């Protein structure tokens, strides 16, 4: 492969300015992530510990193989969306290694609102299951939750992608041979009781875990029977009498040891048709990425400088280098695994879109995973380009992205605007994973453009009615539009709503993509069948 020759001057004032700006964004990200990782209030955590329980993150750590990485999903989900701090939507989710196997871990955090399911908690749980299904990852559920958050029941209970979908997914994953393991370490109430009841194997902790469709208060109200939670649905009931649980644990440590032993018996073997070579570090330091990206998101730069700091040996065999130059495509390796890279280097023209579609066809035919690096304002507009067929050429790219059946991974490294988001494998196009950098922006268009469009429509309407609109009134009209777009395009607004799988520091991108690719190799790469490409 051809080694990328970097033109970056790491001693320049521009590099230092860019690096300083990115460092500030990364520092903010780390502060937010650390605050969310604490979980609930100090009082809630102390109460949890006083019951002899491990804190949720300690549970996850004890479950995983010592020293192994954990690819967390949605670490900042729900932040700022609900009254109080519902950090991480009250749940820890991610991919880790247990007994040598990659698994999806879903861990309730009872120190946050009792582990209750808010709408975003449901969305996060379902996203974790979606990742598990796509990549054929065994699921380990560390259950300690009071069930649905009742004040939000209309957004949690009845719809297709609400609480009930969790159990639908469990049943279908088990049917597909994707193991489901539950460890009941606390409350497991109402519909939540189906998590352990529908798992392949279930562990329950003595004097701590409880499983029941109706808790003691509801039983008393409905039948008049007075009974304790332990006598109604504790470990002795379910391990000795009902058979709902398969393994009886003395405490959290024992339960997690049992779960590790169960995963060790799953007899799952990662198989891949990829030509994997010995991994090599990039020739150019990933720590320099902060200095590559301009502090002004609108400023241009050569995206090859990013690729050079992500791929093995900084080697990249570029495809159609001289054609459609605003889209960079080519082959590389990440941790020895072959990938096809599609990266924005400007606005998308017809030639760029055709080139991208052609490259995706090549990767589909060869069974090579795709990595999208998004920094896109959209497709070119104007009468010349409409007459030239930009709509049908853009549709070719969107069709190719939509129908490609191999693993796709997206990192938003700058702007993600309008139809450019679609052509570059945004969330709607089912990338296996989608991450954002802290400088990223995502919106149907920029705030300035949105304000100008809406102002033009309003002015045209007023002029048609013979009304005047002063420049002062127009400015007052535009200001809140710009502010709203700026707020809603912010990466933290996106990640709170799980439009992505997390915000990551640029220098962590190679590692995150490597873990994502490794997880994807647990599932076979499907053959792609493309639809009609309008010529």
Please state what every model-predicted region is.
Residues 1-535:
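Ligand-binding clefts of soluble mixed alpha/beta catalytic domains
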């Amino acid at each position: 492969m051809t080694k990328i020759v970097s033109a970056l001057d790491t001693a320049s004032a521009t590099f230092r300015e860019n690096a300083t700006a990115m460092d500030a964004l990364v520092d903010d990200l780390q502060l937010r992530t650390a605050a969310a990782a604490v979980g609930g209030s100090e009082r809630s955590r102390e109460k949890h510990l006083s019951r002899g329980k491990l804190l949720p993150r300690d549970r996850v750590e004890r479950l995983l193989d010592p020293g192994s990485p954990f690819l967390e999903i949605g670490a900042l989900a729900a932040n700022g969306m609900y009254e109080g701090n519902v950090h991480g939507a009250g749940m820890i989710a991610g991919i880790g290694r247990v007994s040598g196997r990659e698994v999806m871990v879903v861990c309730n955090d009872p120190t946050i609102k009792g582990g209750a399911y808010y709408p975003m908690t449901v969305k996060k749980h379902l996203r974790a299951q979606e990742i598990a299904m796509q990549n054929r990852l065994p699921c380990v559920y560390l259950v300690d939750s009071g069930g649905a958050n009742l004040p939000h029941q209309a957004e949690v209970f009845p719809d297709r992608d609400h609480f009930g979908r969790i159990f639908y997914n469990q049943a279908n994953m088990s049917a597909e041979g994707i193991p489901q393991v539950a460890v009941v370490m606390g409350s497991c109430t109402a519909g939540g009781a189906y998590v352990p009841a529908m798992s392949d194997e279930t562990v329950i902790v003595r004097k701590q875990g409880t499983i029941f469709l109706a808790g003691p208060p509801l039983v008393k109200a409905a039948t008049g029977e007075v009974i304790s939670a332990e006598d109604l649905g504790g470990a002795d009931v379910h391990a000795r009498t009902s058979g709902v649980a398969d393994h009886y644990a003395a405490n959290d440590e024992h339960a997690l040891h049992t779960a590790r032993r169960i995963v060790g018996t799953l007899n799952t073997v990662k198989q891949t048709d990829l030509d994997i070579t010995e991994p090599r570090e990039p020739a150019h330091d990933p720590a320099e990425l902060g200095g590559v990206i301009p502090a002004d998101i609108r400023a241009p730069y050569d995206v090859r400088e990013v690729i050079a700091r992500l791929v093995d040996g900084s080697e990249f065999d570029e495809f159609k280098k001289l054609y459609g130059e605003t889209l960079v495509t080519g082959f590389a390796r990440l941790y020895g695994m072959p990938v096809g890279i599609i990266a924005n280097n400007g606005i998308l023209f017809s030639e760029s879109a055709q080139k991208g579609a052609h490259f995706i066809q090549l990767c589909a035919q060869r069974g090579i995973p795709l990595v999208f690096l998004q920094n896109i304002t959209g497709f070119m507009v104007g009468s010349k380009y409409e007459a030239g067929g930009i709509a049908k050429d853009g549709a070719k790219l969107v069709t190719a992205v939509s129908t490609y059946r191999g693993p796709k991974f997206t990192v938003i490294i700058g702007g993600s605007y309008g139809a450019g988001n679609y052509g570059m494998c945004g969330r709607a196009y089912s990338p296996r994973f989608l991450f954002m950098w802290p400088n990223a922006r995502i919106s149907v268009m920029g705030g300035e453009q949105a304000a100008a469009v809406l102002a033009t429509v309003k002015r045209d309407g007023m002029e048609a009615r013979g009304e005047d609109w002063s420049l002062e009134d127009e400015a007052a009209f535009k200001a809140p539009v710009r502010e709203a777009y700026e707020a809603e395009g912010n990466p933290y607004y996106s990640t709170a709503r799980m439009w992505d799988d997390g915000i990551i520091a640029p220098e962590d991108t190679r590692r995150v993509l490597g873990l994502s690719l490794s997880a994807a190799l647990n599932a076979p790469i499907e053959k792609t069948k493309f639809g009609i490409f309008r010529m």
